[in-house]
């Protein structure tokens, strides 16, 4: 099964995401800050990366996604966000270029798994 890296500074979200994905048969590696997230992605080469858009670190999820893309990491990136709902903004791939898909917080297990499966299938087609 696919390996997924989940990077989020909120341990509740990190634990819930891991539990949801593992229950569906995915291998999950986690990090609770951008530095550790960068390291685990480089070390484990996951099939999918899940990032929180805002983390209490100098680098947020968007900066980390940009860093991966600049280094040639083509792995699909799904981003957790609560910003679009709070600001009434509709995120799109064109606006947030390095990210392939978004999931709104609070996270729906079915929506998360659906988007993960969609991105993994799309990556296999390439």
Regions found by a protein language model. Name each.
Residues 11-29, 97:
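Two-component/phosphorelay signaling modules centered on CheY-like receiver
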Residues 44-51:
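Active-site beta3 strand of CheY-like receiver
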Residues 30-39, 60-61:
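Helix N-cap/capping motif at the beta->alpha junctions
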Residues 42-44, 68-74:
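Conserved phosphotransfer cores of two-component systems
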Residues 59-63, 70, 83-103, 110, ...:
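Alpha4 helix (beta4-alpha4-beta5 surface) of REC/receiver domains from two-component response regulators
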Residues 8, 52-53:
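Active-site residues of response regulator receiver
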Residues 117-126:
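The C-terminal output helix
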Residues 9, 79-85, 106:
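Conserved active-site segment of CheY-like receiver
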């Amino acid at each position: 099964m696919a390996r997924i890296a989940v990077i989020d500074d909120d341990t509740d979200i990190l634990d819930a995401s891991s539990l949801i994905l593992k229950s569906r048969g995915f291998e999950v590696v986690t990090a609770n800050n951008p530095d550790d997230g960068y390291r685990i992605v480089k070390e484990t080469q996951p099939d999918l990366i899940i990032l929180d858009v805002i983390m209490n670190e100098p680098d947020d999820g968007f900066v980390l996604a940009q860093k991966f893309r600049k280094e040639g990491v083509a792995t699909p990136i799904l981003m957790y966000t609560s910003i679009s709902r709070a600001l009434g903004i509709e995120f799109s791939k064109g606006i947030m270029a390095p990210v392939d898909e978004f999931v709104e917080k609070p996270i729906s297990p079915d929506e998360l798994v659906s988007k993960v499966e969609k991105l993994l299938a799309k990556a296999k087609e390439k």
